[in-house]
């Protein structure tokens, strides 16, 4: 799978202040080292305790702390703009948006059935189910360590008026839903290139729903998309991933006959 600047721009493009996006995601990559890098307990992105949980990734690769810029600083103009966008999106969300977002609290690759087709269910595709479970668990591990590294409070923590439903205790940046859904989508879209646009669109929707219920800032969502590309790129270096990918491709082809 090839990743280029054009592809990244397509994934990141949503109606959001471009100046904020440039300041948060582009300039810090050149000018600002990762936060907390001097903290030895946090500088190992995937610890020995996490190694046994990895399926297609090697320890420390990819590291969110090395790929992503820091999130906006507390009390900064960037943070204020990010929070304003959360409030705007949250208050504009419909009841259907809210229901969809809460319905995706737990999700798997089979949430993409609407984009793929009626045959795309776990009971029909055991190899596909097992493969994507590993893919998602690896993505979750990388993302969770990124959250613990950057320590960004969630929007509803900073502004309690945004609190609704059962609230997560984890940190905000990068978004796990955005990262995991885009990882699933990028891999699935390579398996089913004819469904590429619909698959990617659904992943973007899963991520954006998290802003609509004030679980994440827009910059959390964009960071997840960047991290997802890095994770999938690293997957492609794994022989185990490539072997399982080929087996899943054959299973999907057979299921469509």
Where on the chain are the PLM-derived regions?
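Bacterial N-terminal signal peptides
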Residues: 21-31
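Short alpha-helical linear motifs
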Residues: 153-159, 184-185, 221-229, 249-252
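Sec/Tat signal peptide C-region and signal peptidase I cleavage site
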Residues: 32-37
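Catalytic tyrosine of NAD(P)H-dependent dehydrogenase/reductases that use a Tyr as the general acid/base
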Residues: 14, 173, 216
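Interfacial helix-loop-helix junctions of multi-pass membrane proteins
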Residues: 205-236
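Hydrophobic alpha-helical bundle signature of multipass membrane enzymes
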Residues: 39-213, 244
